[in-house]
Amino acid sequence: MNITVYLGSRSGNRSCYADYAYALGAWIARHGHTLVYGGSRTGLMGKLADGALQAGGQVIGVEPQFFMDEELQHEGLTKLIVTPDMTSRKQQMMDLGDIFLAFPGGIGTLEEISQVMSQVKLHQMEGRFAFLDFDGYYQPMKALIQQMSDEGFVDEDWADAVPFLPSFAALTAFVLGRDLPRPGETWRHFKNHMYRILDLADDAETGETYVVYKTLYGEYRDFIRPLDMFLSEVDHDKYPDVRQKWRFEKTAGLCS
């Protein structure tokens, strides 16, 4: 699957944005997806590409010629597509993507994800989109969309369905199209194994999400295993128990 990410060419005022961008790139690569992005080596864009490439992933950059003239392109990409202008760059990135994510960024990021939302809403393109709302960055956008709905400019059902993903756990569930396990609930795995969910935590270094759970069959033990185990039909024995490597940040965020 191709995941198109829109994000800032600047790094922002807090170092956590760069950490999140790098972890997002690594997450995309480790889950077997191809990253599509704007092709730059600067700011968050460069960190995103570095994370994917260093995790062994495929990265497609789409860069307009005038940025090439300024030598802003990332030199290590799997593929670099050069377009004549920004308009064709945006179209190329939409044509290549299956899922579209808005990471923290500026005016250009808002322009790009807004065009995707409009095209999907008008049934002019297929694909799913979401805002990566790490540390609440896109809460003002969420409030604006709600205001549009309250004032009658967009349908209420559509406004309520726009995804704002606060963590890598939520991103994993969104991409796989599955519900997210929640602390306190009983979870039935595909082999009818029953688990009690105790907690979820993101690994701040890699973006991987882990679930702390207790088995409700056989030996009643606590485990910590990747979220992917709960969202796919794979036996839990295929995933290592990582209780001895607990170093995770809570999903409140790296910026906290």
Per-range role (PLM):
Residues 127-135:
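Short loop-to-beta-strand entry elements in the cores of soluble alpha/beta enzymes
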Residues 88-122, 130, 177-179:
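Active-site/ligand-binding-proximal alpha/beta "capping" segment
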Residues 36-37, 104-105, 133, 189:
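Small/polar loops that bind or transfer phosphate-bearing groups
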Residues 27, 177-256:
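Mixed-charge, low-complexity intrinsically disordered regions
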Residues 1-96, 134-168, 172:
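A cross-family phosphate/adenosyl-ligand binding-site feature
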Residues 107-108, 134-139, 203-204, 218:
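Short Gly/Pro-enriched loop/turn and capping motifs at secondary-structure junctions
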Residues 59, 124-127:
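Short, structured loop/turn "capping" segments at alpha-beta junctions
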